[in-house]
Structures are given as C-alpha cells and as structure tokens.
Amino acid sequence: YGVTDWTFVGTSEGSVSAFHAARMNPQLARRLILTSSVWGPTRNGPGLSDADWTALQATLLWVHHQDDPCEFTSYREARRYASRTRAPLVTVRGGGPEKGGACQAFTAHGFVGVERAVVRAMRSWVLTGAVPADVEAP
C-alpha cells in the first residue's frame, strides 16, 4: 500500500500482540500506543511481564484509566511500566456509566464515557509527537 508511517495500537490483552508486532516489525512501527494493558500472567499468557523493552524501537505511549477495575490491568502497574520504559503515561479519569464485567469494554477498562476524548489524545500524539494532557471526563 505504500504506507511507511505506522502506529500500532493494542488494548488490554491486545497490548501484548501490539508490542510483539511492533518489536518484530521495526521498519514499519514508528509508534506504539498501549492502553489498559495486561501486565501479568493470565490464562492466555504472560502479559507484558516478560516483554523485552530494550528490543522495542518504536516510540511508546501508555494510556490507562486511573480507576481501571480489571484485576489484570491495574493503574499502579501502568505507572510502574511507564517509569520502567521511560515512556509517557496519559492518565484517564472519570466517564461512565459502567455496565458489565470489570475487564469488559463498558467500564473504565474500556474508557466508557470518555472514549472520544481518549482517541483525540492518542491522535494528537500520533500527529504532533507532543505528549497529550491527561484525559478528564467533562
């Protein structure tokens, strides 16, 4: 297709796939955005706990809701990984109303009620390279 400027994005367990895709395709992946990321082991694998961050050439942005209710995707770990990788973390606050299980899309895990603002922040980073401000529900 002739596209040479790619941004890989992964959410929750998809963060693991996006990380490995970016790591394995450095000629394509200029940027990587990981949202509501799975840190530790689940029944599907090790999460990002065994990721080799030194092998990642893409510029990285973390996006995470401060009140993410999913047991595998704590905000505390998001802060730790952002520090460990020396990559910026956009913190999301507010939103709702929530419905469904803790690790489902219609909770803070999926940025319910603030989806557009979160996408605008990510898009701004892709287009400008400037780290966006934290996202707060109006």
Residue ranges and their predicted role:
Residues 14, 18, 49, 77, ...:
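Stable alpha-helical elements in mature extracytoplasmic
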Residues 2-12:
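Alpha/beta-hydrolase fold nucleophile elbow
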Residues 36-94:
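The feature captures the conserved acid-bearing segment of alpha/beta-hydrolase catalytic domains
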Residues 23, 69-72, 112-117:
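Soluble non-cytosolic domains of exported or imported proteins
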Residues 7, 31-33:
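Residue in the alpha/beta-hydrolase core beta-strand immediately N-terminal to the catalytic nucleophile
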Residues 87-138:
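C-terminal catalytic histidine-bearing segment of alpha/beta-hydrolase fold enzymes
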Residues 15-26, 32:
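Short glycine-enriched nucleophile-adjacent loop
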